[in-house]
Regions:
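Contiguous, well-folded functional domains in the mature portion of proteins
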Residues: 1-223
């Protein structure tokens, strides 16, 4: 079943952010056809890579009230207590942070972890070290979002650029209501996504575990 899920995901339509790259590859391939040049193969390979990289499969969030889901596909590379990004104004009290590394083979669409309202979005320029390193959370270019949930608590999701990824896209604004599993952005070509849980919550996952964005439950809100 997992194999068929992977095949179905790889055939998913591309995210709109990938269209310029896909069109560029197709134009290069057509130009290669016109001039009888090896450019056709380069264009086709680039197009196929972009179709795979920007794939955007549908996801079904769990029907469990209070379930906090993974904001991205990938592998958990770090877990621990850490203060959320200061630009969000959530205080300096450490809370559980779950860091997910997205390789170039993972789906790169970011999804909302829980129902709520976006209260703050803050972009910070920075470095571009490998997103698999722990220092990427504090050193790299990032886009941080604070989301207030029904209980009044706030969680944070941080889109982090990587060594190759140099473009972070976010499709929501401050004040927008959001739903669990809803698409809200994408990071191009390898990246990291951090999730800061509300105060007092502990993750239900483990370091090294593979996440499915919008579906894997990372934690549950207290009743």
């Amino acid at each position: 079943m997992a194999m068929f899920d992977d095949i179905r995901a790889s055939l998913a339509p591309p995210h709109p952010a990938g269209r310029p790259f896909i069109m560029g590859g197709l134009i290069a391939a057509l130009l290669g056809v016109a001039i009888g040049h090896w450019l056709i193969w380069l264009g086709l390979m680039f197009t196929l890579f972009c179709l795979y990289f920007f794939r955007d499969p549908e996801r079904v969030p769990p029907a469990r009230p209070g379930a906090i889901v993974a904001p991205a596909d990938g592998r958990i590379v770090s877990m621990g207590l850490s203060a959320p990004p200061p630009e969000l104004g959530l205080g300096a009290e450490p809370r559980w942070r779950v860091s997910i590394f997205l390789s170039v083979l993972n789906v790169h669409v970011n999804r909302m972890p829980l129902d709520g309202v976006v209260t703050r979005i803050a972009y910070r320029h920075g470095a571009f070290v490998s997103a698999s390193l722990d220092k990427a959370s504090t050193s790299n270019e990032r886009n941080a979002l604070a989301i207030r949930v029904a209980s009044g608590q706030e969680i944070a999701v941080v889109q982090i650029a990587g060594l190759i990824a140099r473009r972070i896209l976010c499709g929501v604004r401050e004040g927008d209501p959001v739903r669990t599993g809803e698409r809200f952005g994408i990071i191009r070509f390898g990246s990291r996504t951090d999730l800061y849980l509300p105060d007092g919550l502990r993750p239900l996952v483990a370091e090294g575990q593979t996440m499915i964005g919008g579906e894997t439950v990372i934690a549950e809100m207290l009743p």
